[in-house]
A protein has these predicted regions:
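Glycine-rich beta-strand-turn "strand-cap" elements at beta-sheet edges
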Residues: 2, 39-48, 76-97
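Short, well-ordered beta-strand segments in beta-rich or mixed alpha/beta enzyme
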Residues: 2-9, 39-66
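Short, surface-exposed ligand-recognition loops at beta-strand->loop->(often short) alpha-helix junctions
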Residues: 9-21
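Generic structural motif
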Residues: 11-13, 59, 93
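Acidic-enriched, low-complexity/disordered segments with a strong bias for Aspartate over Glutamate
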Residues: 13-16, 46, 57, 72
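Residue-level signal for secondary-structure boundary sites
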Residues: 16, 60-62, 96
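An amphipathic, aromatic/His-enriched active-site/gating alpha helix that lines ligand/cofactor pockets
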Residues: 24-36, 55-89
Length: 97
């Protein structure tokens, strides 16, 4: 399993509307094949920055979502709030303890 980590910079004074749009659009991500859950958190220091965290089977599962109609609907619901393009990276399994 991998973790998608996306920093989302939202335009000034658009946080409440963005949060409502994300809540409504979550089923689009969570119904995607290979998705094991998603959450969005707001940054404490700068409330215009949000962190999207999604658990995927693989990077390929995330890429398949990005090529799907579900993603187009997610994008239509959320991307117009962004002040800058999202910064998306993927993280591997946790290090052994």
């Amino acid at each position: 399993m991998i973790i998608e980590h996306a920093l989302l910079r939202v335009g000034e004074d658009r946080g409440d509307a963005f949060a409502a749009a994300v809540r409504a659009a979550f089923p689009l991500i969570e119904s995607a094949p290979g998705c094991h859950g998603a959450e969005v958190r707001v940054q404490h220091e700068d409330p215009s920055i949000y962190l999207l965290i999604v658990q995927w089977d693989s990077v390929q599962a995330h890429q398949a979502f990005r090529a799907s109609a579900l993603y187009e609907r997610w994008r239509a619901a959320t991307h117009h709030f962004y002040a800058a393009p999202p910064e998306v990276t993927h993280f591997l399994a946790p290090l052994a303890r």
